[in-house]
Every structure is written in C-alpha cells, then in structure tokens.
Amino acid sequence: MWLLAAHQVLRKMQRRHSSNTDNIPPERSRSQALSPEASVDEGGVFESLKAETASPPALFSGLAGGLPASPFPAGLVLGSTAGGGDVFIPMPATRDEAGGRSAEGSTYHHRQAHHHFHHGAHRGGSLLQHVGGDHRGHSEEGVDEQPGTPAPALSELKAVISWLQKGLPFILILLAKLCFQHKLGIAVCIGMASTFAYANSTLREQVSLKEKRSVLVILWILAFLAGNTMYVLYTFSSQQLYSSLIFLKPNLETLDFFDLLWIVGIADFVLKYITIALKCLIVALPKIILAVKSKGKFYLVIEELSQLFRSLVPIQLWYKYIMGDDSSNSYFLGGVLIVLYSLCKSFDICGRVGGLRKALKLLCTSQNYGVRATGQQCTEAGAVCAICQAEFRDPMILLCQHVFCEECLCLWLDRERTCPLCRSVAVDTLRCWKDGATSAHLQVY
C-alpha cells in the first residue's frame, strides 16, 4: 500500500515537471534536464531571476566603451534561503544558441548600454574634468605667482619711485625757495670752497717740487688766502663771525639751524686757510734750515693739530643751539640732548688727540728707510735714480736691494708704503697728510 502511494506521488511529480519544462526557454530546459533537483521551488526562483541574468553585462557596459557585449553564459541558478544569496553555475552553450542569444543580447544591451554609458560617461567625465580643472588651476596659479607677484622690496621701491614722481615738483619748489632765502650764504660758501680747492692743489704741487718750489707761488697763495679771509670777515663784521674762532658767540639775535650752519661753516673755512698758510711757511723754508725729508713730519703735525682745533670750535655753538634762548621751556629735553652730543663728541675728540700724539711721536723720532748705498751698489743699480731719473744724490738702499735718492725716497714714502720698483713693503708708519694736503672735510658738529 505504501509502495502504491509512493508510486502515485512520483507520477504526479513527473507530470507536473513535464508540463513546466514545455514552456521554459531552451537554456533553462537544458539546465533543468541536467539538474532536476533545482525544480523544487515550484518555478518561483527562476521567474524572479529572468530579468537579472542580463543585468551584469549592462552594469559594465559603460566601462567597456565601444567593445562588443559578450553573451552571458547559460547556467544554473540555485536559490538558497539559509545563505541569503544565489549560487550561479555557468554552463556551456551550443553555437546556434550562442549565436541567437548574442544577437538578442546585443540588441537588448544596446539600449541599456546607451543609458548606462551616457550616465557613466557623464559621471566619469565630470570627475576627470574636476580633477583636471583643479590640476590646471593649481598650475596656472603657480605660473601666475612666480613672475606676477613682485617681491616686497620691489613693491616698496616702486612705491617710493611713484611717490617721488608725484612729490618731486613740490620738493624742487621748496629747495628753490630755500636757496633764494639763503642765496648770499650759499654764494659765499661756494666761493670759499673754490678758494680752498685751488690753494690746496697748488700747495701740493709745490711740495712735490721739493727744492725747485717757487717762492713767488707760495707768497701768492698766502696773499690770496689772506685777502679772501679779510674780505669775508669785513663784509659780515656786524655779525662778529671771528668770535667763534675764540669760542665766543657771534653777534646774532637768534640762533636757528641755518644760522648755526652759517657760523660753523665760515669758521671751518677760515681755519683751513690758516692751516694751508702754515704749511706754505714750511715749504718756503730753505734746505739749510729744514731738510726736505723732514718737512713731511711737520705737515702731518700741523694737519692733526688743525683737525683737533676745528673739532673743538663748534662745541659751544651747538650747546647754545640745543638749549635755545629760553632753556626753561625745554630744560629736560635740552639736558638729554646735550649729554648725547657730549658723549658722541668725546669719541671724536679722543680720536683726534690720538692722531696728534702719534704725529708728535713720529716728529721726535728719526726714521731710517734704509742704509747708505756704496758706489758699487749704485753702479749695479744703473747710476740713475728710478724716481727722479737723475744721478744719485745721497743714495739709500732698501731691504729689497733697490737704490734711490734719499730725498726722492722720503718723498715717495710720504705717499706710499711700498718700494717703487718691486712693491714690497718698505715702511709701516703714518703716511697721511705728509704730502702737504689739507682735509676737505667740513666740520659742522
């Protein structure tokens, strides 16, 4: 009885299975014929997976581009409720079925591929454009920043030049007004500076001539300097400018900045004239009284003493200018400024005193640049001085074995430190101001 019931159930299942296999596609009939156990789900699983079998090629059609879509191979899909997923087993297909399916799949995938390709291309293109745009933006910003962005110093320089271009006319107008107000003082200073330059250059020329100097030229320099000094002091006698030479205040109602420069400038030029006049007297002395080789030391002492005295003259004038006429209004500020001025001035005076001390020490000591040369050494040297191009007079030989006249050598070493021929160091002492020159520095403080 149990066998009969089991046989009837199997017959019903076979009939039901045969009715289901008559209406399914060839691919499914083939797969179910190979695996009849997959029909247990009563046809529910395969109906839901019909549309999903074509979706995998459609998803990747956007990335494939223009490549032909490959047919999705036939296989067996098993439903699994315990695992929560589907298992796909690929199965080979025949040529006819593959050809027909590829034709149908190509038409179906062409529509879906167009949609997915357009969407994927739009999405991928926008991403690439965004990345490329950022890259180009950064590159363009880098290109613009290198040559286009000026350095801070260059921008400040351009701003200064622009400001000067705009303000230059007003600056010139202001300078023209100041020059017109002080035209007399500017003219006097230019004249005295020209006189100093002429007298200084002429004196140096006479010093270089040694015994051949012209006494008449020296007297002319003395007369020229004395005439200029007397003319200036007489023209402005009402101001008593000579009082500043003996540390007194000139006769001025007020002492502003331009008045201070005027008094200090005139006093400095007068002291320079006196310095040149003293040097002219040294040049005019004959060889019997003072040797030519010793005159350079006296020029040095006179110059150092003159610079020290010139630095002392402006002190009392600057004190009066800093304190002002009514010192009670700015007593604290004036006191601070005087202390600062005194501190700075003390360093300058100490330097001048040190230079004068070295000059006096050099004057009191005899300096030998070499030893007397013998007749044989003079003959080997050519019997002619390389400096004056004449026969040797009181020849001296240096450590480098070069022979020169004593006066020529002393005059040369008053300006240089090395041998005239081999440039080896011959002396390491003060050599400034030994040629009769006077400092052109304007001592205004």
Curated annotation (Swiss-Prot):
Cytoplasmic topological intervals: 204-215, 278-330
Subcellular localization, as worded in the UniProt entry: Membrane
Region Disordered, residue ranges: 12-41
Any single GO BP term: positive regulation of ERAD pathway
Residue ranges crossing the lipid bilayer per the database entry: 184-203, 216-236, 257-277, 331-351
Gene Ontology MF term list: ubiquitin protein ligase activity; zinc ion binding
Domain of life: Eukaryota
Inducing or repressing factors: Expression is induced by IL3 and inhibited by LPS.
GO cellular component, one term: membrane
Function, as annotated: E3 ubiquitin-protein ligase that negatively regulates IL3-dependent cellular responses through IL3RA ubiquitination and degradation by the proteasome, having an anti-inflammatory effect.
Protein name: RING finger and transmembrane domain-containing protein 2
Organism of derivation: Mus musculus
